[in-house]
Amino acid sequence: MNKITLPIGMHDKLFKRARVTYEIERDISDFLMAQGFNRIDTPTLEHFEVFSDHVEPHHYHLFDKKGELLVLRPDVTSQIGRVIASTRVHTPTKFSYSGKVFHYQEELRGLANELSQAGIEIIGYPAREAVLEAIKTAKQSLDLAQVKSYQFEFSHAAILQTILESLVLDSQEEAQLLDYIRKKNRTGIFEFTQSRPSEFDDFLQELPYLFGPSQQVLARAREIVDNERILTALDDVEQVLRSLSDLLDQTTMDLGQVATMPYYTGLTFKVFGDRVPDAFLSGGRYDQLFKRFGATELTAIGWSLDIDSVYQAIHDDLPDEGGKEGDGR
């Protein structure tokens, strides 16, 4: 049977799905290059240390013939950090990319383990200018892909980082708390604060409710937290939102937004739509990533778009075509 079945999380694309996802990738890539982004292609296989200091259970690992531990890339941003640190690429610079990334999903939820992405990285430019360009190009890319209804949701990585650094948790405790926050598990968070009391107890217990219209979330958060670093992060998000008022009609915030990648250090954002349960675009600031590769800190922001999720968001609006195999939709 292994000759005709696929590994868990792998899927064939046929007919309309194959054609439209190709067109989305092509059109967004062409648009970004026309906007001055330099195309970059990075290898599918990398040394595992590019992405983590230890073996991650959700990465695909393999040994080459010399016994070196390699990984199928789980994201492209870390690879671009390696490129900046190891070559003579001059900054500031802007990159665009598209290609496959791989994540091993332990849970059998029908999730894809091979993902098609397109994205950008803006490196070395003034922070405010870079943030605005990143969000503008994200919106333009979604519009180009004909996504009709979507919402930008903002947060700031320093909020949870400040709390975690103060609590000094071991890796298991930190993972458990982040899981409670991600799932908005009020009981779990409450029990955690009872066992590990801190100055952030009230804020943590309120986190499952700190999402919705941006100004309401900001106002409520400022009522229950007095930590200077968190307040500065809230101010940073508010300033960005003011700058985006002409571009985005409505914005939301979720202060319990757990960053998709560990390297985010500042503003983070995700984009959600009505027809897709998870975010189909995510991004943020990651100024300190380059230190991982022995380079100096650089202002940096980027985003990645899940092409297959964008297809799910628009495919009901597309005309049918020949071919009836289920995975071809």
Curated annotation (Swiss-Prot):
Pfam families to which the protein is assigned, alphabetical: tRNA-synt_His
A GO cellular component annotation here is: cytoplasm
Instruction: Print the keywords alphabetically.
Output: Amino-acid biosynthesis, Cytoplasm, Histidine biosynthesis
Record's InterPro entries?
Answer: aa-tRNA-synth_II/BPL/LPL, HisRS-like_core, HisRS/HisZ, HisZ
Location in or out of the cell? Cytoplasm
Protein's pathway? Amino-acid biosynthesis; L-histidine biosynthesis; L-histidine from 5-phospho-alpha-D-ribose 1-diphosphate: step 1/9
Q: Main localization of the protein?
A: cytoplasm
Annotated GO MF terms: catalytic activity, acting on a protein; histidine-tRNA ligase activity; transferase activity
Q: Output the GO biological process annotations, alphabetical, semicolon-separated.
A: histidyl-tRNA aminoacylation; L-histidine biosynthetic process
Task: Output the CDD domains linked to this UniProt entry.
Answer: HisRS-like_core (cd00773)
Q: How does it assemble?
A: Heteromultimer composed of HisG and HisZ subunits.
Q: What job does the chain carry out?
A: Required for the first step of histidine biosynthesis. May allow the feedback regulation of ATP phosphoribosyltransferase activity by histidine.
Q: Which family does it belong to?
A: Belongs to the class-II aminoacyl-tRNA synthetase family. HisZ subfamily.
* PANTHER family in the cross-refs: ATP PHOSPHORIBOSYLTRANSFERASE REGULATORY SUBUNIT, HISTIDYL-TRNA SYNTHETASE
Give additional notes from the record: This function is generally fulfilled by the C-terminal part of HisG, which is missing in some bacteria such as this one.
**Protein's name in the database:** ATP phosphoribosyltransferase regulatory subunit
Q: What is the source species?
A: Streptococcus gordonii (strain Challis / ATCC 35105 / BCRC 15272 / CH1 / DL1 / V288)
Gene, per the UniProt record: hisZ
